[in-house]
Amino acid sequence: QNLSVLEKAVPTSAKSWAGYVTDELTEEGVKQTLDEVAYLADYIAGDIKDDYKKLEAIAKWVSDNIYYDRDARDNSVTQSEICIKNVLKSRKTVCVGYSALFSALCEAQGLYVVNVKGTVTSDTVDYSDLADGPVNHEWCAALIDDRWIWVDCVWNSNLKFENNEFTSVGANTEMYFDISPLALSFDHCAYLAEKRYYFRAGEYFSQQDT
């Protein structure tokens, strides 16, 4: 099921791309944030030429530098807490923010990535409930050399923000970078894949002028 969802990735709107970039939804704000993303992506990729290694480096940077915001998770998550601008500024977010930042960094390097919404195992969802469970998570998949590569930067990270404190609850892992489809299916069930073009978000403002 997971792979079949990727093959049917749905297009999204320019307004949604802009909204994932910044909650201000201004042309200047979008441009400024995307400039930051492009600069950071170049910094992370450095002299790496191989697309797979670029993908790996970006995934590792996100997992090593962004904290999972449990305080936000336990309350009502706002657009401000998941937009790329504020994720970069605060270094904390929930799964949607991880997914947005990772995919935007990849887009800046010319990598094809989709954002995946679905169900994962949790305190309230076990394996037997995955197929029928609530949509409670977002992660990514990249297409390189005609092969889909699953990436979950949240599940690779042990950095947490809780009770207004940044903490580490153990060493990070790369288990959920290029995890096999079979292994992923034990705790992730994809429901929908979205294709976003953050660097075309300016189209939204052009549409408003016509």
Question: What positions do the PLM features span?
Answer:
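Secondary-structure boundary elements
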Residues: 2-91, 100-103
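Hydrophobic/aromatic-rich core segments of domains that either
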Residues: 99-180
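Alpha-helical and coiled-coil interaction segments, frequently adjacent to or embedded
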Residues: 160-210
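Serine/threonine-rich low-complexity intrinsically disordered regions
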Residues: 2, 11-16, 26-27, 78, ...
